[in-house]
Amino acid sequence: LHLCDRRQRQMCIRDSRKYFRINKEGYRQPGVFEYRLITQSKKEYSYGIAISYAAKEIISEWLVRIEKNGSETCIFNRDIDESGENFTFSEVTHKNEAEKIKWEIFLDVFGKNISPAMKKKSILSDVAERSNEKSGVLKEIMDVYEWFQSIIILFPTSQYSGLNQLVEKEEVRKFFSGILKYFDTGIESVESKQGEMNFDRIFEGIPKEHAEKLKIRISNDIENDPVMFKVNNQVYSLRKDEEGNIITTKMMQNHGNPQELFEYSDESDGTQRLFDLIPLFYEHQNNRVIFIDEIDRSLHTNLTRRFLELFYSLTEKSDCQIIATTHDSNLLDLDLVRQDEIWFIKRLEDHSSKMYSLNRYKERYDKKIDKEYLLGRYDAIPIFDEEILEDMND
């Protein structure tokens, strides 16, 4: 399942090879994903979707509202009948007749359009494209869709788009400068350098065919908003001035000599990683869920810990949440995170993975979790087979 560009307002199947490929029959088994979430309206939902990897289509989709007393109210439940040619929907309770009619009209259009493309499309994205209702079932579906669209995902090599504000807004640069100085990076301040766009110079070293595609895409995207992109390990922000000229703004760093500024590409991998992470401090007011893969990548262990402590202090009164993977065992500290917030991933004999919480071990709160983990108490550590080395030496 892929969250497409927000302007396209789509959730669709992009890659059908994400099944468990070690099992030869894995592609025949459906992939089932279910989420428990709280929307901006403070309502709790369970949204689920089942996809067929073989047919490359959605075979089931459902949305349930979780009431405060723990009871469940079905918002919709979509399935495909035995023939595979028709959608079926469960009965839904509506507050009034007007809302019921609107929902039936939506289902009538959705159900009649059971094309191959529609089988790949979620109800969430279809409602987002065709409805602007402010109440009722359609509004609830839209709220859940917006929750998915608000998710921030940072992979080790990804570039968070919040950096666009850094090169465009002075107050953001001041904030960045303070945080970078606090983390002892050697950077005194973050500056910006403007000039007219020179595509040939910026795209130097990139194959001409790819460079031309980038030029076209940037020129189209820049019509509405500033565009940020990264090329040759340098970050640029582009916008059009009043005369239609494309202006580029480049991020620069002052390491103590304002006359000799450093480019983004001059910084260490750890400092560049901080540029990806610091914009997250702005998101605590938006109640977003933030996924970070390898949060500790290229960072000193003390810095990673302090980053999390700062984030926790900012989000104490909000519903913002970080879900991160790490190999830094020093973060396994019950003074930093709760037992139910620590999860391990263990590879099983069939090469599948199993997730389980530290909470199952019911450890004392003064336990040194990092030491116990490295000793193998919780599994989820590499096991070195010395016999393999012996066989290689024979």
Model features per residue range: what roles?
Residues 1-9, 13:
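Single conserved hydrophobic/aromatic residue that forms the stacking wall/gate
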Residues 7-10, 248-388, 392-394:
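Switch/communication elements of ASCE P-loop NTPase nucleotide-binding domains
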Residues 14-26, 335-336:
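Flexible phosphate/Mg2+-sensing switch loops adjacent to catalytic phosphate-binding sites
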Residues 27-36, 57-60:
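Short, hydrophobic/aromatic-rich segments at coil-to-beta transitions
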Residues 33-39, 63, 252-253:
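Short beta-strand segments that buttress and anchor functional surface loops
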Residues 40-44, 256-259:
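Glycine-centered tight beta-turn/hairpin loop motif at sheet-sheet or coil-to-beta transitions
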Residues 46-213:
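Electropositive, glycine-dotted interaction segments
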